[in-house]
Amino acid sequence: MAFSYRTPQEELLSRLPQSQQEAISGFQYERFQKEEEKKVENFSFYLPEKTREWFTKSGVYLSPFAYVNHSHPGCKTLENHLLFNVVASYISKYSYVACLSIKSNKMSKMERLGSNSVKTYDILNRLVTAKDKARYGPLARPERSPCPKKTNIFIHDEIHYWSRDQLETFLQVHRPKNLWATLVFPPEILAGYKSSVLPFLYQFEIHGKDLVYMPDGVRSESYTQPLENGFLLSSSSILVRNKATGVEIRYQVSLVYSLGSHHLFHIYPTEDLMKEEVRRFGPYDLFDVGSLFVKPVRVPIQDFPLSVFKKIFIYLSSLKKPDVQSAVAKLRQLSDADISIESVFMVQEFASRVEKNGVGSWSCSFWECMKDWFFDKLPYREVLEKIGLANDFTRRLMKIKPLAFDIHTTDRPLTVRMVIDQIWGERQSSCDDVPNIIFYGRKEWLEHGLLPKVKKGLAKLVPGRETGGSDYPEEIYSDLLSSTSIWRSYDENLRHRKASPIVILKSEKAYSEAPGFSSNCISLCSTPFGEVIERTPFEVERERKKRELSFGCLDFHIRKMKVKDASELSIKLDEQNKEGLRRQKRKEKAKKTRMIPVHLLELGSDQKEKNLGQEASKGKGIEQEERRKSDEAKFDSGPSGVCSIKAENPVDAQHIAEPVPCLKLNDLIGKEKICSSGLIKTVGNDYLTLARQIEDMPLAQLKNRKAAYFCIDYPMVYFHDKISYPTFEATGEIKQIIMRARDKWGANFNSALIQVYNDGCRLPLHSDNEECYDDDEILTINVVGDAKFHTTCHGEIIDLRQGDEILMPGGYQKMNKHAVEVASEGRTSVTLRVHKRDFSFESKLRFIKGKFDCLFVSIAEIIHKKPEEVMMFIPHIVDRCVSNRGCSLDDARAICEKYEIKIECEGDCGLVECGTIGLSVGRMLLRGNHFTVASVRRSSMDSLANSSKELKSNGVLDHVMFNFHKRLRSVEPDLTVEEIKVDSSRAGKLLKSLMDGMTGIVSHNSTHEGWRMIKGINSTSEMRSFMSMIKGKSEETRGDLFDRVQELNFMKVKIYGIFGFAGSGKSHAIQNLIQTEFKGSQGVMVICPRRFLAKDWSEKGVDEKDIKTFESALKSDVKGKRLFILDEISLLPKGFTDLLMLKMHMEGILKKSTIVCIGDPLQAGYFCPKDDNYLSREGEIKRLFKDGVNYKWYSYRINKFIAKKLAIETMNDFIGIDEQNLIYKDMPSAHHFMENKGNHIEVILVPSMIEKELYSNYGNVMTFGESQGLTFNCGVIVLSEEAKLCSDAHIMVAITRFRRGFCFALGSKGSKEDYMRSMKSGLLQRMCSGIGASKEFILGSSSVKLILSEKDVSKGAGVDEMDREARLEGDVWLKSMIYLGKRYHIVEPLGQVIKLTENAIKCHIPVCSSQTLGPELDNIQAREFREFKGKNGWSNQFREEAGPNWKHPYRVNQAMSYEAIYPRHRMDDDLTFLAAIKKRLRFDNVANNYAKFKAAESRGKYLAKVFLRHVPIKCGRDQRLLDQCRQEFEETKLSKSAATIGAHSQRSDSDWPLDKIFLFMKSQLCTKFEKRFTEAKAGQTLACFPHKILVEFSPWCRYTEKVLTANLPDNYYIHQRKNFSELEDFAKRFSNGSMCVESDYTAFDVSQDHTILAFEVELLKHFGWDDKVLQSYIKMKCTLGCRLGGFAIMRFTGEFSTFLFNTLANMVFTFCRYEVPDGTPICFAGDDMCALRNLREIDTHECILSKLSLKAKVNRTKVPMFCGWRLCFDGLIKEPCLIYERLQVAIENGRLMDVIDSYFLEFSFAYKLGERLYSHLEIEQLNYHQVLTRFFIRNKHLLRGDSRHNISELEWLSDEDSDDDKGSQIEDRRRGYSNCWGEKLQNLF
C-alpha cells in the first residue's frame, strides 16, 4: 500500500542531493512566478472545494492565492479561461479581428497576454438585452456599427440570442473569413436532461420557449435566452445562398473547445475537410435517478453523484443487515455540509428497497430469464412499472453508468435528429419534446413530429390498421436498414454498424478456377494460366440462389430510398461511401502493421463498411467484359518489381488477378527443386546459435517430443486435434530467423513451431490446414539432428540433415500431405508459417469442453451463467486455458476481477480469495488440478433468520430450505447422502405400536387421541382404516388418502447423515450454520430423544418450541417446517424416519424438505421391552444407509489415555487424570480419592435405573443411555452385575463421556479379581484389564460399514481457517486486508534446558500493623492546590468523595483515600485533555515537515552509523522471516473476540483518510512512584490509526524487532515481549552494586522529530524495508493530522510499533551522549534507560545532539530503577508501598479480584529474596512489605491459577516452622500485568 504513485522523475529527484534539488526547483519557481504574474488577475477568485477540483481536473489554471470574492466565481473563472487562455490563442494569429459584444477592458487584457496577445482589433457593440446599456456604456446603441466584410470576426456571448435565420443572414451579408463565437448553452438539454449535470457550476430552468441560465446557481445573476438557439451544437455546416449570384456557400461549423456550458465555435467557408459527425460530452459523475426508479416518486430529483452512490451501494452490500439509517449516515460521511434534501430521500428510497427485497443476484434461473424475456416483450412495460405492477430494479441497477451522451451533427435545419447514447435509450429521445423543439422548431415539430407519432400510436389500437411489415428478404438478418424507418436510415450514421453488403453476381458461366500459384521460386508443376475446371451442379445452384438473394436486397434498398434504379441509389449514398473508403483503407493499413489476437481487434472493417454505392451502380446488366477490363487495369498499374503479364484472352486474364513477383538470380542460389509440386530444399545453413537458444526455452513435454509456439508481436494460441502448445512472443534469435526467412523466401512468415523429438518419433501423413492458416508457404528448418521427410506428391523420401530447409509453397497443403520420421535423438525442427487469424471461439470451445473447462463451469454455476458466456466475456483466459491445457488460480482471479466479484477457492495451499470487490459469492474447491463448486452464496432471500416473526410466505421458505443441503455440504465435509423410498409397512408397524401404547407414553389412541398424528384423519376408526391401507390390507382403492399413500411408491427421498465417534463434532457444523444464518427461524425442527440434548440445541439458535421428542414431533403441525434434524437417530424407535416421512407427505411438504440424521453406529440404540418383539429388527441407521456412512474417526473430547486404548486420534491434549481406569472397591473410596486429587465428580454413570436410585445421594447420577450425547470433565462408572450384561455400544457411551477422565467403582459383592473373572469378553473387559480395544474390534461392532474420515492433528496445518472468517464477520472491511488462506507454522525443535535453582532462605518478618502506614496519607495536599484551573472550573484528577463501587466502611477521610494519592485521567476531563495537547503535541504544516526531513537526512545517516557500530546488523532482507511476521501479526489481530473486532470495524472503513488520526486521551490512574502526592499532570494522548495503516506497517515492524533481537549483543537488554523473570536474570548476571546511570528524558514522544525520522529511515533501509513502504512511512509522518490541524513530525502513543522506535531513539541517544565500552550492560525499554555501570559523558557527537529535540537529565545512583523495578545483584524488587497502595485502591473500588493475582506476582519477586531483602529496602518499605505478606497469606483463597500454587510454596517461608522441604523454587514466573507500565509496554500493533 503505497500512499501515492511516484514517477521515475520523482524517484530520481528524491535521490539527488539537496543542492541539486534546489537548483531544479529554482527553474520551476521562475516558471511558476511568470505564470502567476500573468494570470493572477483573472484566476484568483475564491472557489468552493468541489469547483476547484473540477477546474483542476479540466486543466484550468487556478491561482493558489485565491482571495477575490465574486457573486458567481465559477462561471466567471470559466469565462476568463475561455477568453484569455482559449480564444486569445486562436484569434491572436490574425492581423485584424472585429470583436462584437465584448467590453473594452476585456480586450485590453487580451492585448497584454504576451505571445497570445491580440494585435489589431475593433470593438463593435450593440444593445441586445436590458443590461447591455450599463455594460457597454452610454455610447452603445441598439443598432451595431457597420461591420467590415470578408474579415475575421469574434462574437462573445451573443450568438445564443441569434436564431438560425439571423446567423445565416449575417454570414450572407458579411461573408467572414473566420467567425469565432462563444456560446453559453447547457448541452445536456439536447439529451433530454431537465437539470444541470454540473449543479455546482451552473443551473438552468426551462420556461416554455425560454431558457433561464443561472451561473453558479445564483438566481439573481440569471439571464434568459431563447431555447431554440442552441442549434449550433448539432450543426455541422450552414448553407448560405448568395442572393446576387445564386451561388450556395457552405460554412463549416467546428466546435473548437467545450467546457461545462461554455463553448467556442469556429465558422468558416467549407474546405475539403472531414466534418464533425458526432460531438461527445462526458462522462459526468452523475447517473439518471429516473432510469433507476421508474415508478413515480415524490422526490423531484433527476441526478445524483455516481461515485457517492457506488460507495453507498457497496457499503450496504457489505452489511449483513442493511438498513436505511446506515445508508443515510454513509451519505453524510461522504458528502459535505451542503446535502440536498432530495438526495436524502433518494438514498432512503434506495436503501429501503435493498433492505426489503435485496438486490437480487447477478444471474438468474431459467424461469427468471423467461420472466425477464416476457417482461421485455410487453408493449406497455413502462406503464406497468410506473404504476407498480412490474419491477425490474436489479437489471436497471446493473446498467447504471456515468452520464455521457453524444450529439450527432447535420447540415439540414429541419431534419436534424438527436441520437442519444444507449444510457438513455430511444424511448426517451422519441418522447422528449425539448430536444425536438430545439431541432425542428415548435411549429415544425407539432406538424411533422408529434401528429404522425399520435397517428401511428392510434393505428396500433385498431385491428388491421398496423403499418405493413417490410418486404426485405428474410434470409438477411444483419442489415440495420431493414429494421429502421426512412428518416433514420437517411439521417443516422450507419457506417459504424455491421450491415449486409449488396451482392451482385456478374458471371454467367459455370466455371471454377483452379488455385493460383505464387512463389519466389520456379516450379515445374504450377497450374498453367487459363486452365479451368467445370463447376458441379451443387455449385451452380448455390450461386444461383446467391444471385437471386442479392437482387432481392438491391430491389429493397431501391424502393426504400425512393429512387428509380441502382445508379440513383449510388449517387444518394456517394458521400457516405467516400468516407467509408477512407476509413477502410486506414483500418486495413493498421491491421497490416501488427498482428494481434482476434478478441483484441475491432470487427473487421470489411464487415462494417461496404461500398454499397459502387456495387449498386453496376446494376444487373454489367457484363463479364467490364469486370475483366477493370482487373486488367489494376494489374497493369501494379508496383515496380512485379511482373505485369497480360493475357491474350479474357478467360486467361481472370487468373492473373494477383501479381506474380519477378524472380532474381540470388533467390535461386543454393536451392534444390524436389518435385513438380514446387517443393524446395536448401542445404548448408548455420543454425547453431538458434540451437543453443532452444535448449533454454520453456518447451512443453508432449508425447515423444517437446514443443512451443512463437509468434511475432503477440503470442497467438495454437492447437490441433487433442494437442495444444504453449505460446510465446518471438524475440531474439527466433525473431531474427523469421525475419530472415521473410526476406529470403518472400513469404510473410510470422510464427514458428519449435519441436524437439525423441528418437524414433513418427508423425503420420497430415496437412497443416488448421483454420488459423491460409494456404500459404510453410518452411521447415531442420536445426539439429536427422529426419526423413515423406510427401504424397512424389514417392521419394527426402533426407533432412542439420541446417537443411524445406519449403512447401502456397497451395501445397490442399493437394498433398506430408509425414516425418525422426532418425536421431534430440532432433530439433522449426516450422515457420503465416498465422493469418485466430482460431474461432467454437474451435476453442470444442477443444477445452469437458476436459479443461472446469474453472469456467464452476464460476458459471456460481454466478448463474452459461460457461460459454463466461468464456466469451474473457477470451484471453480461454486462450491461456488452451495453451496451458487448463486454468490456474491466476485465471480465476482474472475472471473475478473482470466480473468484479469475489470467490473463495480452497485448495491444497489453503483458502485463497479471488477478486477484491464485495463479499464472496461462492466457494470453489481445487483438488487434483480440478475446480469444483463447494458452495454458492445465498441471496438475500435465502436467510431463514430474517425475522423472528412467523413466515407467511411459503415460497421464500421453500426456496431456502430446498437449498439448505447445499449450505450444509459446504460446512460439513463428511456428509452422507442416500436416496430411499418410504417403507410403508415399517411406518405402519410403528404407528400401530404407538396407537396401542406399546411405544411411547402420550400417543395411545384411546387416551391421548393418537389419531391426530396424521393429517386428514379425524377419528379412531379412520386411523384403523388408514393403518390397514398402508399395510396393504384395505379393500378401499379410491379416495384422497389412498391416492396420496400410493404416491409414496413412486417417490424417492434424499436423506442426509452426519456420523462420527463420540465427541467428533457431529452436530457442530450444522449448529453453527443455524446459529449464524438461521437463528430464530420458524422452519427448523429438531427431534431429540434426550432432554439434555434439547438444551444444547436451544443454546445454538433453535427455538425451544421447535425442539421435540419423537412423539411430540409426530403429533405437532409440521406444515411450516422445511428442515428436520434427527439427533442421535440410533435412539429413535425403529420405523420412526419412515413414519415421519409419511406424515410429511400427507401434509404436502416431503418434496420441499430436508432431513438430516445425526448419530453414531458404535453407540447405544433404541430399546423398549414392550415393542421389541413387534417393531422391525433393523435399526434406523442400517435401514437408511445400507451402503455405509462417512464416519468421523477422531474425537475432540476424550483424553489421550482413553484415545490410545481405543486406537483413535484425539484433539484433547490432556493425558488423563491419575485415577484413570482405576477400579475402586466401592463408591465412597472412589469419591474420596477423586476429590482429594482435585478431580470433582460431575456425574456417576450406572447401567440400570435401580442403581440410579441407589446412588442418588452421591450427586448427579445417570444411566449409560441417558448420558448419550453429553460431555463431562470427570466422573465415576459403576461396575455392577448389570454392567456385565450391557452391550459394547452402551459401554462405549459410558467411557467416552469424559474430557479429563474417569475411574471405576465396584457396585457388586466380591473383589476386583472376582468381578474380572466373571466378566465376558467384550469392550468392558478390555478396558478394565487395561488391554484396550483395537481398531478392527471397534469397527466390527458397527451395524453398517464405516468409511473413516481421519483428521490431521499435527500442529500448524491451517489451524485457524474457519475461525478467521467467523472472527471478521463484524468487520467486513478488515476481512479484505487479512490473508484467509492456509497458514503454516514452523515448529521449533524442542531441547532440554537445564536451569539451576537457588535455595530459598527462611525469614521471620517483624510484625507491623497497617495502621502505622496511615499517617503517610497526611502528605496529600488539598485538592485546590493540586488541580489545573481554568476559566470554566477545575480539572477532575483527584477524588474527594467515595466512588460508586466503594462497598467498604470508610476507614479514612474520603478526601484522603488511597486513590487521592495519584492523579487520575478521564476522557471527560477537558482541562486535562487541553494540558495534554499543550504538553505532548506539536503542530506544523506539511511543507515544513518535508523541508526539515530533507535537511536532516545527512544527520540521520550519521546516527545510523553510530547505532550500527554498537549493534552490528547484517544488511538485507529475510523474506521468510518477513512472511512469518505478517502471519504472526494477523494471528494476534484475530486473537481478539469477534465482538471486539466488530466493535472497532469503523477503523477499517476505506473512506477513512490515511493522513488523519482520531486523537483522544488515555483514561488511567497514574500509579508511578514519582507521581505520589503530586499536583495534576497532563494527560497521555492516544492516536487511533486506520487499520489499513496498521496492516501495512506492522509486519515490517515485527520483522525489524525480530532482526534487532537476533543481533543484539548480550550486554544490551530490551524489555519487549519478555517477562520479568528474564529481566531478573539480567540483573543477577550484570549488577555489581556500582554506580549506575539513568537518562530521564523530557517530552520524549514530542522530541521524535525530523532528525530521528531521518535516522529511522536510514536504519530501516539497512534492515531491508521495501522502498515503497519506506516512502509511505515518510509521507505518513510528514502529512499526519487530525481535527486540530497538521502535526509536526513526532511520535504518538498508539502508533504502530511505538515502543520499538522509541527504544531505537533511546539507544542511539545513549550511544551519542555516553562513552559506551564494549560489554557495558544497559537496559532499554521505550523511553526508559538504565546503565548498570558508571558511564562517562562525551561531547564527540555534540554537533548532532545539539540539533536534536531530544534532551535528557543524567541521574547517577546506586539504586537503579528500570520499568518501576529496583535492579540489584539479587534480582528485582517492586516498591512495596506501590503494591500496597494499588491494592487499597482496588479494594476501595471493588476490583480486588481483578488485580490480586498480578499484584501477588509482583510481590513474590521481593519476597523470595528472604533475608537478603534487608540489604536493599529501607525500614519504611520493609513495613509495607510485611503488611503485604500478611495480606496475601490471609487471602490466598482469592488467588487463582499459578498464583494459588505459588503461595503454597511461599507460605512455609513466613512464620511457620516445618522440616518438610517441599522445594522452594518457583520456576518461570510470569509478571502478567503491572498497571500503568504494563499498559505502556504492551505491543500496540
From Swiss-Prot:
Domain (+)RNA virus helicase C-terminal residue range list: 1193-1337
Per its record, the protein catalyses: RNA(n) + a ribonucleoside 5'-triphosphate = RNA(n+1) + diphosphate
Q: Which InterPro entries match?
A: (+)RNA_virus_helicase_core_dom, AlkB-like_sf, Alphavirus-like_MT_dom, DNA/RNA_pol_sf, IPNS-like_FE2OG_OXY, Oxoglu/Fe-dep_dioxygenase_dom, P-loop_NTPase, RNA-dep_RNA_pol_alsuvir
* Fe2OG dioxygenase domain sequence ranges: 748-836
User: Could you tell me the Gene Ontology terms of the biological process aspect for this record?
Assistant: DNA-templated transcription; mRNA modification; RNA processing; viral RNA genome replication
Quick one: which residues bind ATP? 1060-1067
Query: What are the UniProt keywords, alphabetically?
Result: ATP-binding, Helicase, Hydrolase, Nucleotide-binding, Nucleotidyltransferase, RNA-directed RNA polymerase, Transferase, Viral RNA replication
Region of interest: Disordered: 607-639
The EC class name is transferase
RdRp catalytic domain sequence ranges: 1634-1741
Q: Which SUPFAM superfamilies match?
A: Clavaminate synthase-like, DNA/RNA polymerases, P-loop containing nucleoside triphosphate hydrolases
Question: Basic and acidic residues composition bias: which ranges?
Answer: 607-635
Question: Where does the (+)RNA virus helicase ATP-binding domain lie?
Answer: 1027-1192
Domain named Alphavirus-like MT is located at 63-239
Q: Which GO terms describe its molecular function?
A: ATP binding; helicase activity; hydrolase activity; mRNA methyltransferase activity; RNA binding; RNA-directed RNA polymerase activity
Which Pfam families does this UniProt record tie to the protein? 2OG-FeII_Oxy, Peptidase_C34, RdRP_2, Viral_helicase1, Vmethyltransf
Enzyme Commission number, as recorded: 2.7.7.48
What task does this protein carry out? Answer: Involved in viral RNA replication.
- The name this protein goes by in its record: RNA-directed RNA polymerase
Q: Which organism is it from?
A: Apple chlorotic leaf spot virus (isolate apple) (ACLSV)
Classification lineage: Viruses, Riboviria, Orthornavirae, Kitrinoviricota, Alsuviricetes
